[in-house]
Amino acid sequence: MDKSLTRRTFLSYALQQGPVLAVGASFMQLSTLSHAKGFTVAGPLKAADANGIRLPKGFKSRIVAISGKKVSNSQYEWHQSPDGGACFAQGDGWVYVSNSEEYFPDGGVGAIAFDGQGNIKDAYSILDNTVGNCAGGATPWHTWLSCEEVNCGAVYETDPFGKKAAIKRPALGYFKHEAVAVDSVGGQLYLTEDEKDGCLYRFTPSKPLPDLTAGVLEVAVVDAHQRVSWQAITEPNPWNTALSTRTRYQVKQATQFRGGEGIWYQKGLIIFSTKRDDRIWVLDIAAQTIKVLYDAKQHHPAILSGVDNVTVSPSGDILVAEDGGNMQLVLLDANGSPTPLLQVTGQADSELTGPAFSPDGQRLYFSSQRGQDAEQRLGITYEISRL
């Protein structure tokens, strides 16, 4: 995108509304992300198109799936309440996976397969009979980790291509999971928890990735200087034993994050959102320090609010989906400055979910979780591309 990140130092706010701090050089990795051809954005949003989406000049939208209706060229009825998603390369095409934030037995994950020209060639389920699958995370070994957002929620490792059965991963803990990001260099996973007093978790596997069968689950402890340390959870699966203490209460010093949402790994940084205070955070893995990149309270009016799913654009901007707010997908540059990428109109009781770019960076997928009928939860999944 033309709004690519620069090397200007950006300002962020301390953990508890402290003084403004200059971010060190290690955080400037945000400004060195690779550029992709084709998906560049410039200019204000135009009037809504036929699908009710306001886009910048030069872009178009199409509907690829609607809840309760069969996806083109398949027998799969698209699930209700589409939520977190990701794209995976497949031959000269790709697969877009999407969680279903429905309750048992309707939760799970669906997938749409596209050919190299973006035509839909199939759709199918890759996980079913689960509960409240909210977001998740793609792995470098091409699986999708789907997170249950319930008190005893688990993480399931799924195959986007529909060839292998899903596997439950208890070692990642039982709690109100939201999303997960994989640090492929350090060999660790980072997980968010959607509770008003939730934690940021880190999982270190006992064996090298991609083995997730066993390991150590820890919570972040942040000091007054925004330095991060980690303390182990004594029992990551409290709902399976006589121990009733939930994971977020097992370490007294654990730092509370107010409603953890989307999370993303990018070149040594962990980027995540917290919805109850409308913040975007950046954790520097090497330095083990954490900063606030965006705080809605510092913007009047707040262009970005209701922060939720997070991804990174081909040009390196952080892309944040709004749960409510103005029903926008919003870009953040290295200064934390927000710019709307698109806006969905006529669906004020919904939320935007699952933003993901195709492997070539030419197309963007996302959903309006409840569409125009919030009661029936008839979600709509869209594709954005150039004219």
Model-derived segments and spans:
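Sequence/structural signature of beta-propeller domains
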Residues: 3, 10-387
